Amino acid sequence: MTKNNEVGWNLDNSYATLPQSFYTEIPPTPVSSPELVKLNHSLAISLGFNPEELKKEAEIAIFAGNALPEGAHPLAQAYAGHQFGHFNMLGDGRALLIGEQITPSGKRFDIQLKGSGPTPYSRRGDGRAALGPMLREYIISEAMYALDIPTTRSLAVVTTGEPTYRETKLPGAILTRVASSHIRVGTFQYAAARGSIEDLQSLADYTIKRHYPEIEAHENRYTALLQEVIKKQASLIAKWQLVGFIHGVMNTDNITISGETIDYGPCAFMDNYDQGTVFSSIDTQGRYAYGNQPYMAAWDLARLAESLIPILHEDEEEALKIAQDEISKFSVQYEKQWFIGMKKKLGLFSNEEQDQSLIEQLLKMMEKYKADYTNTFRSLTLDTLENTPLFDSPEFKEWYKLWQSRLEKQEESKENAYEMMKNNNPSIIPRNHRVEEALEAAVTNGDYSVMEKLLEALANPYAYSTDQEEYCVPPAPTNRPYRTFCGT
């Protein structure tokens, strides 16, 4: 173990206080010649690290799993999950939690190495990761953070100097992922499937203490836990929908209890507005299509509620009723959050009866004319309606008049309305073709400048800067349909 006081390591290991069935202690597998290719300076500082120290060889060795910082307690977490509806016992097959960094402000964040070698949960996998998917997770997770969407984050990416073998030979890499925690719906499913009520209670109590301490004294704290997670997920999914983000693999092991977005494998952002948009190559039935995401979140949360039944109430029928009552509230909470967000996207401060139909009409027209989701709202925000099939259509012109008169009815000025729109309609998202272009340059040519430029533009999605304009252009029709693969 290396001592790193100048660096800023301040690790704790509260997860290891859970019953040992929840994890396996295992060291990372060393790699031959690690090289740091990306470090997140601002995140490093907020975690209490000195970024310049993190660039030194001793710290790069930690990011590669060749050394451990003082206080590290590497472990692979066990969990279960419904993957495309099928239940499996799972676990960290190629990731290790090395500890929880306590920040200068007293916050706690998991530090996880992804691609750190095989674990008892690897299921015939090699425990390694390829450079492209690790850089992709870095780009998208940081873009999500800039969009103000709760997310895990990326501290560093190192190349390993070793190949990984998938369909082809690819350069290996390890991502250092930072999360409020890695406790998932699947973690609770794992506890419930093992049948120990004591273990289930231990996990629930730990989760409450870590994420929802305000409900610790609640007389029905496990019901309150379910309520809090439902609230967090309703807000999160609404935020996804409002920016056109499609996760692609909403299995229960990818739904966090903290309400953060996790696992950027086959995710992508929607170009043309279409409720049926799917990018993932393995989602052949469209289970996790854009328009299905709220329903799938409710389904996943129902699996959490099921797992909690043994501790919701001593009477099983009563426990079942509590679970059903709470799950039924998800759709109401989601709709409310989405509606509030959509009104902000259209500059609507007050509540009017016509607002719902105003929103629905616009979305219907966008789908009909295959309008670009992000750029339609961007154009409305800038009030520059260039020639597009949507903006040239008679029904849009009619809608535009209604919308303008609705804005004029408000007490707030139009200037304030457009300002609110600017703060809620990103002018830039990580366009799929731009992300691929950056990855191609980095992985194939070792040129990280394309990625750096993209990251710089994505860091301020609401800036409406002229420097970002080249990134606002949708892909050429030949670039569609875009397909994603579960590389992360």
From Swiss-Prot:
Its cofactor is Mg(2+); Mn(2+). Mg(2+) binds at N254, D263. InterPro entries: SelO. ATP binds at G91, G93, R94, K114, D126, G127, R177, R184, D263. It comes from the Bacteria. The keyword Ligase does not apply. Keywords: ATP-binding, Magnesium, Manganese, Metal-binding, Nucleotide-binding, Nucleotidyltransferase, Transferase. Its EC number is 2.7.7.-, 2.7.7.108. Disulfide bonds: none annotated. The active site is at D253. It holds the Pfam family SelO. One of its GO terms (molecular function) is ATP binding. The keyword Transcription does not apply. It catalyses: L-seryl-[protein] + ATP = 3-O-(5'-adenylyl)-L-seryl-[protein] + diphosphate; L-threonyl-[protein] + ATP = 3-O-(5'-adenylyl)-L-threonyl-[protein] + diphosphate; L-tyrosyl-[protein] + ATP = O-(5'-adenylyl)-L-tyrosyl-[protein] + diphosphate; L-histidyl-[protein] + UTP = N(tele)-(5'-uridylyl)-L-histidyl-[protein] + diphosphate. HAMAP family: YdiU_SelO. Belongs to the SELO family. Nucleotidyltransferase involved in the post-translational modification of proteins. It can catalyze the addition of adenosine monophosphate (AMP) or uridine monophosphate (UMP) to a protein, resulting in modifications known as AMPylation and UMPylation. This is Protein nucleotidyltransferase YdiU.
